Regions:
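An N-terminally biased module of ancient metal coordination in phosphate/nucleic-acid-related enzymes
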Residues: 1-115
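Extended substrate/RNA-proximal surfaces in nucleic-acid metabolism proteins
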Residues: 2-6, 71-176
Length: 176
């Protein structure tokens, strides 16, 4: 895989996969990986095999798993299983050349004629990662049946979860 920054000619066709849900995704997590590192290893092995240049890490109302994938890539040089490196030096270089961006999936009303919610995908410039939580999620609200409004940032989602079940601790309420 060639480095994205070494383009010296006009248009170049590249493969992008902009909707990659991860282990621990907020809805319908059916991944069988033992842990997040194992999931990321499989993800990047497949991305290298398919020569994917851009990956959008997708989740509902969150960029937490995007941050975990970025952390995985940042620490990839130290990744070992049974004392052996998981990726070769060339694979590590190629993985670090894959452009990874946050893709926030939103579900909204009204529903379609078939009763399904409308999905909207918001792709963000990774340079603005730190402001997504407060500026973006803090400006979106969910109106509960009671009329109570909840911001769709982490604290607002926890409050919403606890309004559904007051016995939940923060992390469980966030996932609810």
């Amino acid at each position: 895989m060639s480095n994205q920054n070494s383009i010296s000619r006009g248009s170049v066709w590249r493969k992008w996969d902009l909707q990659v849900h991860t282990k621990g995704t907020a809805k319908n997590d059916q991944f069988t990986s033992a842990n997040f590192d194992e999931f990321c290893t499989a993800l990047f092995k497949k991305a290298l095999e398919k020569e994917i240049s851009v990956v959008g890490i997708t989740d509902y109302f969150s960029i937490e798993n995007y941050k975990k994938v970025k952390k995985f890539v940042a620490e990839i040089n130290n990744l070992k299983v049974s004392g052996k490196k998981v990726f070769s030096d060339q694979e590590i270089e190629d993985i670090k050349g894959i452009f990874i961006l946050p893709n926030v999936e939103l579900r909204m009303m009204p529903s379609t004629d078939s009763g399904r919610l409308i999905n909207i995908h918001c792709l963000f410039n990774p340079d603005f990662e730190s402001s997504i939580e407060n500026d973006f999620f803090g400006s979106i609200e969910y109106s509960a049946g009671s009329g109570t409004r909840f911001k769709m940032n982490r604290q607002g989602i926890i409050s919403l979860g606890k309004s559904l079940d007051s016995t939940l601790v923060d992390e469980a309420a966030y996932k609810k």
